[in-house]
Protein backbone atom coordinates (compact mmCIF):
# COMPACT_ATOMS: atom_id res chain seq x y z
CA UNK A 1 0.00 0.00 0.00
CA UNK A 2 2.98 2.36 0.43
CA UNK A 3 3.31 2.38 -3.36
CA UNK A 4 -0.07 4.12 -3.63
CA UNK A 5 0.47 6.93 -1.15
CA UNK A 6 3.92 6.58 0.33
CA UNK A 7 4.78 5.68 3.92
CA UNK A 8 2.66 6.94 6.81
CA UNK A 9 3.97 10.26 8.14
CA UNK A 10 4.36 11.39 11.74
CA UNK A 11 1.18 13.48 11.68
CA UNK A 12 -1.03 11.05 9.76
CA UNK A 13 -4.47 10.37 11.26
CA UNK A 14 -4.72 6.59 11.13
CA UNK A 15 -7.95 4.78 11.94
CA UNK A 16 -10.20 7.87 11.91
CA UNK A 17 -12.44 6.73 9.07
CA UNK A 18 -15.68 5.41 10.55
CA UNK A 19 -17.28 3.76 7.53
CA UNK A 20 -14.43 2.66 5.25
CA UNK A 21 -12.71 0.42 7.72
CA UNK A 22 -9.99 -1.95 6.48
CA UNK A 23 -12.41 -4.88 6.63
CA UNK A 24 -15.05 -3.12 4.55
CA UNK A 25 -12.53 -2.03 1.95
CA UNK A 26 -11.12 -5.54 1.70
CA UNK A 27 -14.64 -6.96 1.38
CA UNK A 28 -15.35 -4.44 -1.38
CA UNK A 29 -12.30 -5.65 -3.30
CA UNK A 30 -13.45 -9.24 -2.73
CA UNK A 31 -16.87 -8.46 -4.24
CA UNK A 32 -15.30 -6.68 -7.22
CA UNK A 33 -12.98 -9.57 -8.02
CA UNK A 34 -15.81 -12.08 -7.56
CA UNK A 35 -17.85 -10.07 -10.07
CA UNK A 36 -14.94 -10.21 -12.52
CA UNK A 37 -14.79 -13.95 -11.89
CA UNK A 38 -18.47 -14.40 -12.66
CA UNK A 39 -18.35 -12.34 -15.85
CA UNK A 40 -15.30 -14.31 -16.99
CA UNK A 41 -17.66 -17.31 -17.26
CA UNK A 42 -20.38 -15.42 -19.13
CA UNK A 43 -19.20 -16.68 -22.52
CA UNK A 44 -20.05 -20.25 -21.54
CA UNK A 45 -23.54 -19.29 -20.34
CA UNK A 46 -24.76 -18.28 -23.79
CA UNK A 47 -27.76 -20.32 -24.91
CA UNK A 48 -28.93 -21.65 -28.27
CA UNK A 49 -32.50 -20.99 -29.39
CA UNK A 50 -33.32 -23.71 -31.94
CA UNK A 51 -36.19 -23.23 -34.39
CA UNK A 52 -37.01 -26.93 -34.77
CA UNK A 53 -38.88 -27.15 -31.47
CA UNK A 54 -36.05 -28.80 -29.53
CA UNK A 55 -35.02 -27.61 -26.10
CA UNK A 56 -32.55 -24.71 -25.88
CA UNK A 57 -29.11 -25.57 -24.57
CA UNK A 58 -25.70 -24.12 -23.92
CA UNK A 59 -23.85 -22.78 -26.95
CA UNK A 60 -20.29 -23.96 -26.37
CA UNK A 61 -18.86 -24.87 -29.82
CA UNK A 62 -15.35 -24.78 -28.36
CA UNK A 63 -15.76 -21.36 -26.77
CA UNK A 64 -14.86 -22.79 -23.37
CA UNK A 65 -11.33 -22.85 -24.75
CA UNK A 66 -10.95 -19.71 -26.84
CA UNK A 67 -12.95 -17.60 -24.35
CA UNK A 68 -11.32 -19.28 -21.33
CA UNK A 69 -14.70 -19.61 -19.64
CA UNK A 70 -14.75 -23.33 -18.82
CA UNK A 71 -16.50 -24.24 -15.57
CA UNK A 72 -17.06 -27.79 -14.28
CA UNK A 73 -20.61 -27.20 -12.95
CA UNK A 74 -22.01 -26.69 -16.46
CA UNK A 75 -21.23 -30.09 -18.05
CA UNK A 76 -21.43 -32.01 -14.77
CA UNK A 77 -25.01 -30.88 -14.18
CA UNK A 78 -26.20 -33.39 -16.78
CA UNK A 79 -23.32 -35.88 -16.69
CA UNK A 80 -23.70 -36.62 -12.97
CA UNK A 81 -27.48 -36.88 -13.14
CA UNK A 82 -28.14 -33.71 -11.15
CA UNK A 83 -30.47 -32.46 -13.88
CA UNK A 84 -32.59 -35.58 -13.30
CA UNK A 85 -32.76 -35.01 -9.55
CA UNK A 86 -30.47 -38.00 -8.92
CA UNK A 87 -28.88 -38.31 -5.49
CA UNK A 88 -25.06 -38.12 -5.50
CA UNK A 89 -23.13 -41.40 -5.18
CA UNK A 90 -26.28 -43.40 -5.89
CA UNK A 91 -26.52 -42.41 -9.54
CA UNK A 92 -24.01 -43.86 -12.01
CA UNK A 93 -23.36 -43.60 -15.73
CA UNK A 94 -21.41 -45.58 -18.31
CA UNK A 95 -18.58 -44.01 -20.28
CA UNK A 96 -17.80 -44.65 -23.95
CA UNK A 97 -15.31 -47.33 -22.88
CA UNK A 98 -17.98 -49.16 -20.86
CA UNK A 99 -16.68 -48.02 -17.47
CA UNK A 100 -19.25 -47.35 -14.76
CA UNK A 101 -18.69 -43.98 -13.10
CA UNK A 102 -20.01 -42.32 -9.95
CA UNK A 103 -19.68 -38.77 -8.65
CA UNK A 104 -16.01 -38.29 -7.76
CA UNK A 105 -16.33 -35.32 -5.40
CA UNK A 106 -15.99 -35.50 -1.59
CA UNK A 107 -19.22 -35.82 0.36
CA UNK A 108 -19.85 -32.17 1.24
CA UNK A 109 -19.04 -30.99 -2.27
CA UNK A 110 -21.42 -33.60 -3.65
CA UNK A 111 -24.18 -32.54 -1.29
CA UNK A 112 -23.51 -28.90 -2.14
CA UNK A 113 -24.10 -29.72 -5.80
CA UNK A 114 -27.23 -31.69 -5.01
CA UNK A 115 -28.78 -28.93 -2.88
CA UNK A 116 -27.88 -26.35 -5.52
CA UNK A 117 -29.48 -28.51 -8.22
CA UNK A 118 -32.66 -28.87 -6.18
CA UNK A 119 -32.74 -25.09 -5.72
CA UNK A 120 -32.25 -24.51 -9.45
CA UNK A 121 -35.06 -26.93 -10.29
CA UNK A 122 -37.38 -25.21 -7.81
CA UNK A 123 -36.42 -21.88 -9.39
CA UNK A 124 -37.21 -23.31 -12.83
CA UNK A 125 -40.58 -24.62 -11.65
CA UNK A 126 -41.64 -21.30 -10.14
CA UNK A 127 -40.11 -19.07 -12.83
CA UNK A 128 -39.86 -21.16 -16.03
CA UNK A 129 -38.93 -18.16 -18.14
CA UNK A 130 -35.54 -16.54 -18.41
CA UNK A 131 -32.29 -18.54 -18.39
CA UNK A 132 -32.37 -22.28 -18.94
CA UNK A 133 -32.13 -24.58 -15.94
CA UNK A 134 -28.40 -25.29 -16.13
CA UNK A 135 -27.65 -21.55 -16.17
CA UNK A 136 -29.84 -21.08 -13.11
CA UNK A 137 -27.92 -23.91 -11.48
CA UNK A 138 -24.62 -22.21 -12.21
CA UNK A 139 -25.83 -18.79 -11.03
CA UNK A 140 -27.23 -20.17 -7.77
CA UNK A 141 -24.03 -22.10 -7.13
CA UNK A 142 -21.93 -19.02 -7.90
CA UNK A 143 -23.88 -16.96 -5.37
CA UNK A 144 -23.36 -19.59 -2.67
CA UNK A 145 -19.67 -19.93 -3.51
CA UNK A 146 -19.27 -16.15 -3.41
CA UNK A 147 -20.73 -16.10 0.11
CA UNK A 148 -18.29 -18.83 1.14
CA UNK A 149 -15.40 -16.83 -0.28
CA UNK A 150 -16.49 -13.78 1.70
CA UNK A 151 -16.50 -15.93 4.82
CA UNK A 152 -12.97 -17.10 3.99
CA UNK A 153 -11.77 -13.52 3.48
CA UNK A 154 -13.39 -12.43 6.75
CA UNK A 155 -11.81 -15.32 8.67
CA UNK A 156 -8.39 -14.56 7.18
CA UNK A 157 -8.76 -10.89 8.10
CA UNK A 158 -9.60 -11.82 11.68
CA UNK A 159 -6.55 -14.10 11.79
CA UNK A 160 -4.18 -11.46 10.40
CA UNK A 161 -3.64 -9.68 13.71
CA UNK A 162 -1.60 -6.51 13.23
CA UNK A 163 -1.31 -7.00 9.47
CA UNK A 164 -4.96 -6.76 8.33
CA UNK A 165 -4.05 -5.34 4.93
CA UNK A 166 -2.27 -8.56 4.03
CA UNK A 167 -5.76 -9.99 3.50
CA UNK A 168 -6.05 -7.76 0.44
CA UNK A 169 -3.59 -10.08 -1.31
CA UNK A 170 -6.23 -12.79 -0.96
CA UNK A 171 -9.33 -10.73 -1.74
CA UNK A 172 -7.82 -9.07 -4.83
CA UNK A 173 -5.89 -12.04 -6.18
CA UNK A 174 -6.13 -12.52 -9.97
CA UNK A 175 -6.72 -16.21 -9.26
CA UNK A 176 -10.19 -15.29 -8.01
CA UNK A 177 -11.11 -14.09 -11.50
CA UNK A 178 -10.13 -17.33 -13.20
CA UNK A 179 -10.79 -19.99 -10.57
CA UNK A 180 -13.51 -18.84 -8.15
CA UNK A 181 -16.34 -20.44 -10.14
CA UNK A 182 -14.45 -23.06 -12.14
CA UNK A 183 -15.08 -25.74 -9.52
CA UNK A 184 -16.13 -26.09 -5.88
CA UNK A 185 -12.78 -25.40 -4.21
CA UNK A 186 -14.12 -22.37 -2.32
CA UNK A 187 -16.13 -24.69 -0.09
CA UNK A 188 -12.98 -26.31 1.33
CA UNK A 189 -11.15 -22.97 1.43
CA UNK A 190 -13.89 -21.44 3.58
CA UNK A 191 -13.75 -24.31 6.08
CA UNK A 192 -9.94 -24.19 6.20
CA UNK A 193 -9.90 -20.42 6.77
CA UNK A 194 -12.41 -20.65 9.62
CA UNK A 195 -10.46 -23.57 11.13
CA UNK A 196 -7.27 -21.47 11.16
CA UNK A 197 -9.13 -18.64 12.87
CA UNK A 198 -10.46 -21.00 15.53
CA UNK A 199 -6.97 -22.40 16.06
CA UNK A 200 -5.58 -18.88 16.44
CA UNK A 201 -8.30 -18.20 19.03
CA UNK A 202 -7.18 -21.31 20.93
CA UNK A 203 -10.23 -23.40 20.23
CA UNK A 204 -8.50 -26.57 19.00
CA UNK A 205 -11.54 -28.86 19.26
CA UNK A 206 -13.73 -26.68 17.07
CA UNK A 207 -10.79 -26.03 14.77
CA UNK A 208 -10.42 -29.78 14.30
CA UNK A 209 -14.14 -30.21 13.63
CA UNK A 210 -14.23 -27.46 11.02
CA UNK A 211 -10.98 -28.65 9.42
CA UNK A 212 -12.50 -32.13 9.19
CA UNK A 213 -15.48 -30.65 7.36
CA UNK A 214 -13.03 -28.98 5.01
CA UNK A 215 -11.38 -32.32 4.29
CA UNK A 216 -14.83 -33.73 3.52
CA UNK A 217 -15.41 -30.89 1.09
Regions found by a protein language model. Give the residues of each.
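Transmembrane-helix signature of polytopic, membrane-embedded enzymes
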Residues: 154-173, 206
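Short acidic/glycine- and proline-prone juxtamembrane loop motifs at membrane-interface regions
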Residues: 180-188
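Voltage-sensor/pore transmembrane module of 6-TM cation channels
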Residues: 206-217
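TM-lumen/periplasm interface segments of multi-pass membrane proteins
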Residues: 1-161
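Specific aromatic-rich, kink-prone transmembrane helix
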Residues: 155, 174-175, 188-206
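Residue-level signal for helical boundary/lining positions with a hydrophobic bias
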Residues: 102-103, 169, 181, 214-215
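Alpha-helical hydrophobic/aromatic positions enriched in membrane-embedded helices and signal peptides
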Residues: 98, 175-177, 210
Amino acid sequence: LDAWGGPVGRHAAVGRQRFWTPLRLIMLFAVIFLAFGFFSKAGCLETTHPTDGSQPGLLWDGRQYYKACYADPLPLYSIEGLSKGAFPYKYSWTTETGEERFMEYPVLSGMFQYVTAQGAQAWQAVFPGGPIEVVKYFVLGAVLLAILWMVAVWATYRSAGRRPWDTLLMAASPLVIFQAFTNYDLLAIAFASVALLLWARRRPVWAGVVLGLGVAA
